[in-house]
Regions:
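Short hydrophobic/aromatic patch on the recognition helix
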Residues: 51-61
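Amphipathic alpha-helical segments used for helix-helix packing
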Residues: 108-127, 145, 173-181
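Amphipathic alpha-helical linker/stalk segments
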Residues: 35, 71-99, 115, 144-150
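Amphipathic alpha-helical packing segments from all-alpha helical-bundle domains
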Residues: 77-80, 107, 127-152, 158-166, ...
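Hydrophobic alpha-helical connector segments
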Residues: 70, 84-110, 161-164, 191-194
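Alpha-helical DNA-contacting segments of helix-turn-helix folds
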Residues: 24, 33, 61, 67-75, ...
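C-terminal peripheral helix-coil segments that are non-catalytic and often amphipathic
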Residues: 1-9, 106, 142-149, 174-226
């Protein structure tokens, strides 16, 4: 008999296999959250969605909130990084505002049905979504102020900046809520929403030169009646 006895049963997981299981749990959490929000999120639903045993779940997470926080981390990072990247270009005025708006819409497009519970809980202090929203907004505010300072433009007042960001949030919520469950908003709705967002952002964060320039762009503002 050898000095060591061979281990019985299945071989230990590799690091790659462990990461795959962990990712599977996080993905399942996102899918359950999309249907139920945080109020209906439970370990039982997550393991059913992931097709794993309860002991497997607890090998990676202590409760249903832990994988949800990873979902929210990824969501925040996607929005903040998307806006940060959009504002790194040497753009001015109108183009800068449009890039900010397109970053919001690109972020929303990647969330699908998750947008409904995400936006429904944005202003609920009891939901972890609310705290994540505030952290994301703080980072976005700092990014916008830094860009305005870099361009030598007056820094927007806190109220103007929040008005612009909250309108972007609200419009994205409206178009996501109008879509059928499990589907994306139709392109016409998104295009109309984009124009609404551009108008509001220009009015709150722009100056007279920006508005005059935007007046010449097709489709941004309706022509005055003749």
């Amino acid at each position: 008999m050898s000095e060591t006895t061979a281990r019985r049963g299945r071989p230990p997981q590799t690091k790659q296999q462990a990461e795959q299981v962990r990712s599977r749990i996080v993905l399942a959490t996102a899918e359950v959250f999309s249907r139920t929000g945080t109020r209906g999120l439970s370990v039982a639903q997550i393991i059913e969605q992931a097709g794993i045993a309860r002991p497997t779940f607890y090998r990676y997470f202590a409760n249903a909130t832990e994988p949800l926080l990873l979902v929210l981390d990824a969501s925040n990072e996607g929005l903040v990084e998307g806006i940060r990247n959009a504002l790194t270009v040497t753009a001015e005025g109108v183009e800068l505002g449009i890039r900010l708006i397109d970053a919001f819409l690109d972020w929303a497009r990647g969330h699908g049905p998750m947008l409904r519970p995400l936006f429904a809980e944005l202003h609920d202090p009891a939901s972890p979504v609310s705290g994540y929203r505030e952290r994301a907004l703080d980072e976005i505010r700092a990014t916008v102020r830094e860009k305005f300072s870099e361009l030598g433009r007056p820094i927007p007042s806190p109220l103007d900046l929040d008005a612009a960001l909250h309108v972007c949030e609200y419009v994205v919520y409206r178009i996501s809520a109008s879509a059928a469950p499990g589907s994306e908003p139709d392109p016409e709705t998104v295009a109309a929403a984009r124009v609404t967002m551009i108008r509001v952002v220009l009015a709150t964060l722009g100056n007279t030169d920006d508005l005059n320039y935007a007046m010449e762009l097709p489709g941004i503002f309706p022509a005055a009646p003749q």
